[in-house]
């Protein structure tokens, strides 16, 4: 299930970003930064477990310029199109 991130998701988003950052995949972000940009995030939830397994944020600079930030999908859920769905959700907004 794909949805906009909620305040209760911030710690999980932060944990996922830190995990990915420690593996050299994305840049780290602070809790404050995530709270401040929460409206930019989408999360993907495993319907069976209710666990957040993917995250993505897009920051819009101008009408025709944006940047995908903090794209991460749990290793166990990769190669299923989840990252693509997250990016498409961010772009379609």
Give short role names for the model-derived ranges.
Residues 43, 50-59, 66-72:
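Conserved beta-strand in the GNAT
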Residues 48-49, 76:
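Residue-level recognition of short loop/turn positions
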Residues 32-38:
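Short loop/turn motifs at secondary-structure junctions and domain boundaries
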Residues 73, 79-92:
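Conserved acetyl-CoA-binding loop-helix of GNAT-fold acetyltransferases
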Residues 27-31, 88-89:
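A generic local structural motif
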Residues 1-27, 45-46:
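Short amphipathic alpha-helix that is part of the acyltransferase structural core
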